From Swiss-Prot:
This protein's name: Protein Wnt-2
GO MF terms held by the record: cytokine activity; frizzled binding
Keyword Lipoprotein found: yes
Gene3D superfamilies: 3.30.2460.20
PANTHER family per record: PROTEIN WNT-2, WNT RELATED
Keyword Secreted attached: yes
Species assigned in the record: Bos taurus (Bovine)
Family membership: Belongs to the Wnt family.
Lipid group attachment sites (O-palmitoleoyl serine): S212
Length: 360
C-alpha cells in the first residue's frame, strides 16, 4: 500500500467524525425524567461533566428547565404545524427528535435556537416567581430613571433576563464547547441567536400613580413578552436562514452562496439542505406525511398537493359538536346551544408499494 493510500485511511475516521455529528443536546430529555434531582442528573444520558455539576448544584433550576422543555417543544410544533416535518418528538429517544437532527439542516438550526431561547425564558420566569435560590428580580433595576415620557421609579419585579442568559449559556453550550467540529460551531451560533431573541422582546411596563390616574408618578419594570413572540421571530429567521460553509482556518463561517449577505449574530445558519420529509425514512429521521391532515383549499405548505407530495389524499366525513347561537344574558352569562357540524377531513395517502413488493 503506497503512502498516499495510507494517508487516506488514516484521515477517514476524522472525516466521518467531522461529517457525522451526534445530536448533542441530551438535556432535552429532562422533560421525560422524573424523580429526585440526583436521579435526574445521573440518568439523563449524554450530559458532560460541567452540565452534571450544574445539575447537582442547582436542582431547582433544572426543574425549571425541564418544565421549559415542554413549553418550547409545543412552540416548535405550533410553528411547524402546517409543514411536512412538524417538530414531532419521540418519547423513548434521549435526543427527543430522533435522527432528523443529525443533519445540519435549517430544521436543526431552528430547534437549537428555540430550545436555547426556551431555557432563558424558563429560568428568567422562575427567578421572577421566587422559585430559585440563586436569583430573584433584576437587582440592577432600582432607583430613578428617565425615558421619552419623563422620569420614573424602578419598582415591581423586573425580569432578571441577564441571569437567565448567563445560566443558559453555561448549561446549554457546555457540550458544544468541548467540540471543535463544524456542527458544534453551528449549534453554538444558533444557541446564541435563540438567547438573543428572548431579550429582543423584553419590554418596559409602567403603572401610573396620582389623582384620577394623572400619572404624576410612574413605577416601571422590565418584563419578557409572551414566548409566542420569540417563536414567531425565530420562525421568520428559519425562513431566512443562511447556508454557510466553514472558513479555511475552521474558526467561523462564510456564506455558501456569495450572493447572500454574511450572517449576523441574530441569523440562523445551516450547512445541509433538508430532506423533503415525504416518506418514512429511518436513516433520515423522517416519519413521512402519510395520514397527515391537509387543507384542500390552501395554496400553502399545508395544502393537500404540497403536504401529500403529490400522492393524493383520502376524505373522511365526520361530525362534531360545537357551541352555536350564543346569547348574552344579563347579568352575566353567555348561553349557547349544542349544534352538530358536518365536515370533511382530508388525510394524505401512503406511498404506493413498488410492483415487486406486492404479494403474489
Amino acid at each position: 500500500m503506497n503512502a498516499c493510500l495510507v494517508g487516506i485511511w488514516l484521515w477517514l475516521p476524522l472525516l466521518f467524525t467531522w461529517l457525522s455529528p451526534e445530536v448533542s443536546s441530551s438535556w432535552w430529555y429532562m422533560r421525560a425524567t422524573s424523580g429526585s434531582s440526583r436521579v435526574m442528573c445521573d440518568n439523563v444520558p449524554g450530559l458532560v461533566s460541567h452540565q452534571r455539576q450544574l445539575c447537582h448544584r442547582h436542582p431547582d433550576v433544572m426543574r425549571a428547565i425541564g418544565l421549559g422543555v415542554t413549553e418550547w417543544t409545543m412552540e416548535c410544533q405550533h410553528q411547524f404545524r402546517q409543514h411536512r416535518w412538524n417538530c414531532n418528538t419521540l418519547d423513548r429517544d434521549h435526543s427527543l427528535f430522533g435522527r432528523v437532527l443529525l443533519r445540519s439542516s435549517r430544521e436543526s438550526a431552528f430547534v437549537y435556537a428555540i430550545s436555547s431561547a426556551g431555557v432563558v425564558f424558563a429560568i428568567t420566569r422562575a427567578c421572577s416567581q421566587g422559585e430559585l435560590k440563586s436569583c430573584s428580580c433584576d437587582p440592577k433595576k432600582k432607583g430613578t430613571a428617565k425615558d421619552n415620557k419623563g422620569t420614573f421609579d424602578w419598582g415591581g419585579c423586573s425580569d432578571n433576563i441577564d441571569y437567565g442568559i448567563k445560566f443558559a449559556r453555561a448549561f446549554v453550550d457546555a457540550k458544544e464547547r468541548k467540540g471543535k467540529d463544524a456542527r458544534a460551531l453551528m449549534n453554538l451560533h444558533n444557541n446564541r441567536a435563540g438567547r438573543k431573541a428572548v431579550k429582543r422582546f423584553l419590554k418596559q411596563e409602567c403603572k401610573c400613580h396620582g389623582v384620577s390616574g394623572s400619572c404624576t408618578l410612574r413605577t416601571c419594570w422590565l418584563a419578557m413578552a409572551d414566548f409566542r413572540k420569540t417563536g414567531n421571530y425565530l420562525w421568520r429567521k428559519y425562513n431566512g436562514a443562511i447556508q454557510v460553509v466553514m472558513n479555511q482556518d475552521g474558526t467561523g463561517f462564510t456564506v455558501a452562496n456569495k450572493r447572500f449577505k454574511k450572517p449576523t449574530k441574530n441569523d440562523l445558519v445551516y450547512f445541509e439542505n433538508s430532506p423533503d420529509y415525504c416518506i418514512r425514512d429511518r436513516d433520515a429521521g423522517s416519519l413521512g406525511t402519510a395520514g397527515r391532515v391537509c387543507n384542500l383549499t390552501s395554496r400553502g405548505m399545508d395544502s393537500c398537493e404540497v403536504m401529500c407530495c403529490g400522492r393524493g389524499y383520502d376524505t373522511s366525513h365526520i361530525t362534531r359538536k360545537t357551541k352555536c347561537e350564543c346569547k348574552f344574558h344579563w347579568c352575566c352569562a353567555v348561553r349557547c346551544q349544542d349544534c352538530v357540524e358536518a365536515l370533511d377531513v382530508h388525510t394524505c395517502k401512503a406511498p404506493k408499494s413498488p410492483d415487486w413488493a406486492a404479494p403474489t
